[in-house]
Amino acid sequence: MKIPESEFNIQIKDNFLSEEDFKIISDVGNKIRFNSNDLSYTNKENNHVWFTADAPKIVEDIIKENVSKFFNIKILNLNVCQYSMVSKSKKTEVHNDFSEETDFQTILYVKGNPNIHSGTGFYIKEGDNQILNTHIGFNPNRLVSWTSNVWHAPLSFSDEFQPRISLIAQYKLK
């Protein structure tokens, strides 16, 4: 499947959730014991590891309701809603999540070092290369959204990076 060219439509909203809803999401994230059954590898060359755990229904419902209301969109399907813990890596793991089932996604930063180096980088393609164009720092309860064909990566390669927990969601919109 050919990935369509991407224009950036990245939106950032600090204090996205109410204190009550963020506490629920944060409490669930803090109780997760990420282990070897939760590993996700990006590719065979680098084997950068993401630890993931599916979010419970209460968290899915909070995310769907708030994203739908904030962006004034109708969500047909929530394809992915999972906690992700990213560890430090030596290389950038640039990727996009485009598929027929996913056209919009969000990351809600939950727990980590609140600085730019624990956030997410957004890239443009120049030939066979991806060039960092925009980076967004980590801040708890910050929601970042973009279309699924945008190239992105955690900024986990910098010296200042510390492990972070985020809530990743991917949607099919009406």
Predicted regions and their residues:
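Non-heme Fe(II)/2-oxoglutarate
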Residues: 1-82, 89-91
